[in-house]
Amino acid sequence: MVHLTGDEKAAVTALWGKVNVEDVGGEALGRLLVVYPWTQRFFESFGDLSTPDAVMNNPKVKAHGKKVLGAFSDGLAHLDNLKGTFAQLSELHCDKLHVDPENFRLLGNVLVCVLAHHFGKEFTPQVQAAYQKVVAGVANALAHKYH
């Protein structure tokens, strides 16, 4: 559960309505893979990830980034039940993929950076604070099934 004020919830929802999930998702996942290259080991089937340009232009990275932000959108619609919303994804990432749960926090922070880049002055400190709460809540929910 993420505790947001009414104003924070409104700010998150208003900005998210303007997000191009495909563009932002691809950029966020791509940046994660470039900035934290050890995360690439989970995406070996994606082909060429040898350079930042290769990562950022990789169609599989873009497609998976869109999928990730689709799940994030579901989370925004269920802020009062993030653990339930992400239970299956948590189990998948824990039991089958063996993803370090710290990677969820890293991706959330990268997403905040990408949103700031895309929305400039509209991404005020207050909006950032609200999004930081949301990405922390999502990361916590995704890590929930870990032992």
Swiss-Prot record:
Keywords: Acetylation, Heme, Iron, Metal-binding, Oxygen transport, Phosphoprotein, S-nitrosylation, Transport. One of its GO terms (cellular component) is blood microparticle. It holds the Pfam family Globin. Transmembrane segments: none annotated. The modification S-nitrosocysteine is found at C94. Red blood cells. The modification N6-acetyllysine is found at K60, K83, K145. The modification Phosphoserine is found at S45. This is Hemoglobin subunit beta. It comes from Saimiri sciureus (Common squirrel monkey). The gene is HBB.
